[in-house]
Amino acid sequence: MNYLFKNGRYMNEEGKIVATDLLVQDGKIAKVAENITADNAEVIDVNGKLIAPGLVDVHVHLREPGGEHKETIETGTLAAAKGGFTTICAMPNTRPVPDCREHMEDLQNRIKEKAHVNVLPYGAITVRQAGSEMTDFETLKELGAFAFTDDGVGVQDASMMLAAMKRAAKLNMAVVAHCEENTLINKGCVHEGKFSEKHGLNGIPSVCESVHIARDILLAEAADCHYHVCHVSTKGSVRVIRDAKRAGIKVTAEVTPHHLVLCEDDIPSADPNFKMNPPLRGKEDHEALIEGLLDGTIDMIATDHAPHTAEEKAQGIERAPFGITGFETAFPLLYTNLVKKGIITLEQLIQFLTEKPADTFGLEAGRLKEGRTADITIIDLEQEEEIDPTTFLSKGKNTPFAGWKCQGWPVMTIVGGKIAWQKESALV
């Protein structure tokens, strides 16, 4: 099916939002211009809505295989499509871990069979993410590994991390890291700060993250490796990443929507839906993340979509697993709380969710360019809705944002020229 989207708006190559039509033919973007006419195409009048590149998320957890009670590739990618994401990068903390030919081939077969959006799987740095034996990077790359990470646990052995970075650099691949120094975690369930003190909870100190990042940056410099930092959360982390970039070290970084919108002051009670890793930090950390995003220290926004069951989250804040769902709330949360409040522009938000992650990892995505695959998201910037977890397509309903009123909701997502999801009656 070919589609002609009429009367939309998009961000052009100069970074300005302008009026446009967009023609999709044979799965490709055929033309982006005003006043397009075409035969043999279904005309869809988007009536002033935003025509955006499909959103790109480099940090997601789909749980399959091994965690299908939390999420599956099918439910997770449907949720991604509903959130406007057309390309997502799946972390390797599954069971089994994609750490060898057999496991990666199985994962890729599952993705091919079940995914509703483009899914790029990470390969593990170490076997079973145990930190002691390096995986076969060459084989994992051959089988389509997006990059290498032991996400969920930082690689604690510096010699192992250096060896991994050297091998990744030879393959022109990135090493991606969840950064925690295990000896400083303190069995914490929240940030070490006012909230932990008030509620008598063990806290995770900010330096637990920043000291690990500082170590890895120096290792990346020694290995001449592209090093990407997951979900930055502290003022100290922003500082060391900024210093590294100024020194010319190949480091990039991401931040989550929840760390941009919330800090520990916003946690109303010991509610496990506010438990994520890294935890919500202090107000100064929150302000540093915004500053880092604006000055280019932080390159992109990634959801860290981490679904869990209601039963798991009901165990209380100390025992419940870390993580919240992110796909279906990311864009409206960011548009409402950052763009509408004048903290960033709409153009910047689009870049942080599309071209910046794509460019950082060399993906042919993130831009509406003629000849490229038609991965497109239509967004109604005027639509206001209340976040209702019962309507999520994800199996995970675990969100701290239930009841929040937000504007800017995706209404249609096109992947490879085909409609992957659309809101009922949104474009009628």
Swiss-Prot record:
Listed pathway(s): Pyrimidine metabolism; UMP biosynthesis via de novo pathway; (S)-dihydroorotate from bicarbonate: step 3/3
Result of changing residue 63 to A: Lack of activity
Membrane-spanning ranges: none
Top-level EC class: hydrolase
Enzyme Commission numbers on file: 3.5.2.3
Catalytic center residues: 304
Catalytic activity: (S)-dihydroorotate + H2O = N-carbamoyl-L-aspartate + H(+)
Amino acids binding substrate: 61-63, 93, 277, 304, 308, 322-323
PROSITE patterns (alphabetical): DIHYDROOROTASE_1, DIHYDROOROTASE_2
Cofactor: Zn(2+)
GO cellular component terms, semicolon-separated: cytoplasm
Molecular function GO labels: allantoinase activity; dihydroorotase activity; zinc ion binding
SUPFAM superfamilies assigned: Composite domain of metallo-dependent hydrolases, Metallo-dependent hydrolases
Single GO biological process annotation from the record: purine nucleobase catabolic process
Cofactor stoichiometry and binding remark: Binds 2 Zn(2+) ions per subunit.
Keyword hit for Protein biosynthesis: no
Stored InterPro entries: Amidohydro-rel, DHOase, DHOase/Allantoinase_Hydrolase, Dihydroorotase_CS, Metal-dep_hydrolase_composite, Metal_Hydrolase
Ligand binding (Zn(2+) 1): 59, 61, 151, 304
Oligomer and partners: Homodimer.
Annotated function: Catalyzes the reversible cyclization of carbamoyl aspartate to dihydroorotate.
Family from the record: Belongs to the metallo-dependent hydrolases superfamily. DHOase family. Class I DHOase subfamily.
Protein name: Dihydroorotase
Lineage, broadest ranks: Bacteria, Bacillati, Bacillota, Bacilli, Bacillales
